[in-house]
């Protein structure tokens, strides 16, 4: 079954099938940073309805403070994700989330993240459409705009 199905139904994907799905740093709901890839596992984050994406973030990456219009829930799949809430990146506000950790990205609540020495995979689900808006427009990755 296609991963981009827009209706809830039966879905079974192996890791190889997830890796084969659409990817890029310019996907809707992604940070827009070069090197960060987003794979759509289910649904379409640009449209109304349930979606799930997998965010792959390289080691030593900082994602500045940003928001999304929708409420999102996330699970850290691999690596340690350092995540915090606030209008500006603040290393003191980060909480280290190892694999299996769960966190929320409430709609319009500013948050930020960072990876350490290892890459991180995070599975994020929400009810679209979603977007990404940086709190400080100067932190918006070049060419990213609002995604």
Name what the model sees in each region.
Residues 1-49, 138-147:
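A short, N-terminal "cap"/entry segment at the start of jelly-roll beta-barrel domains
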Residues 31-34, 45-47, 67-68, 75, ...:
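Extracellular/periplasmic catalytic domains that process cell-envelope and extracellular macromolecules
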Residues 41, 100, 122:
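Divalent metal-coordination and catalytic microenvironments
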Residues 44, 81, 87-108:
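Short acidic-glycine-tyrosine-enriched beta hairpin
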Residues 48-68, 96-98, 102, 106-107:
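Conserved short histidine dyad/triad with adjacent acidic residue
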Residues 58-61, 67-88:
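Glycine- and acidic-residue-biased ligand/ion/polar-headgroup-sensing regions
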Residues 63-65, 83-84, 105, 110-116:
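Short beta-strand His + acidic residue motifs that chelate non-heme Fe in jelly-roll/DSBH
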Residues 92-95, 112-147:
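Double-stranded beta-helix
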């Amino acid at each position: 079954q296609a991963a981009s199905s827009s209706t809830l139904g039966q879905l079974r994907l192996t890791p190889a099938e997830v890796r084969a799905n659409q990817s890029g740093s310019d996907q809707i709901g992604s940070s827009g940073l070069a090197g960060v890839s987003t794979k759509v596992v289910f649904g379409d984050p640009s449209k109304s309805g349930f979606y799930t994406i997998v965010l792959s973030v390289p080691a030593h990456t900082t994602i500045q403070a940003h928001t999304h219009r929708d409420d999102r829930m996330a699970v850290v799949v691999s690596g340690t994700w350092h995540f915090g809430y606030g209008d500006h990146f603040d290393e003191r506000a980060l909480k280290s989330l190892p694999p299996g950790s769960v966190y929320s990205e409430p709609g319009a609540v500013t948050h930020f993240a960072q990876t350490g020495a290892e890459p991180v995979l995070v599975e994020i689900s929400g009810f679209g459409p979603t977007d990404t808006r940086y709190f400080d427009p100067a932190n918006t990755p070049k060419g990213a705009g609002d995604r």
